[in-house]
């Protein structure tokens, strides 16, 4: 009888612990990414790797990429909002 009660308690505590862990993982907020034109890039953006390097090194952005915005391709940097 004592082993059965102990087993039920262990099972209950294990399930409770799993629910708490999964709840924390499932509701982790996702950071929003903000985009803005590079303030240091000059001219038409042709190579996204160059844009990315400049955004990361000079503007402390997470990344950068070339995108078309009228009238030409521009370098855009991406930051955590």
From Swiss-Prot:
Claim: DNA-binding is one of the keywords in the record: no
Biological role: Antimicrobial peptide probably active against fungi like B.sorokiniana, F.oxysporum, F.graminearum, F.avenaceum, B.cinerea, P.beta, P.infestans and P.debaryanum.
Pfam families per UniProt: Gamma-thionin
Residue pairs linked by disulfide bridges in the UniProt entry: 34-81, 45-66, 51-75, 55-77
Highest taxon of source: Eukaryota
Similarity annotation: Belongs to the DEFL family.
The species this protein was found in: Stellaria media (Common chickweed)
Keyword terms: Antimicrobial, Disulfide bond, Fungicide, Signal
Any GO BP annotation: killing of cells of another organism
Leader peptide range in chain numbering: 1-31
The protein, known as: Antimicrobial peptide D2
């Amino acid at each position: 009888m004592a082993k059965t009660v102990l087993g039920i308690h262990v099972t209950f505590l294990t399930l409770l612990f799993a629910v708490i862990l999964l709840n924390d993982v499932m509701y982790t907020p996702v950071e929003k990414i903000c985009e803005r034109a590079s303030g240091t890039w000059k001219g038409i953006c042709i190579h996204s790797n160059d844009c990315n390097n400049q955004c990361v090194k000079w503007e402390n952005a997470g990344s950068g990429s070339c995108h078309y915005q009228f009238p030409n391709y521009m370098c855009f940097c991406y930051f955590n909002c």
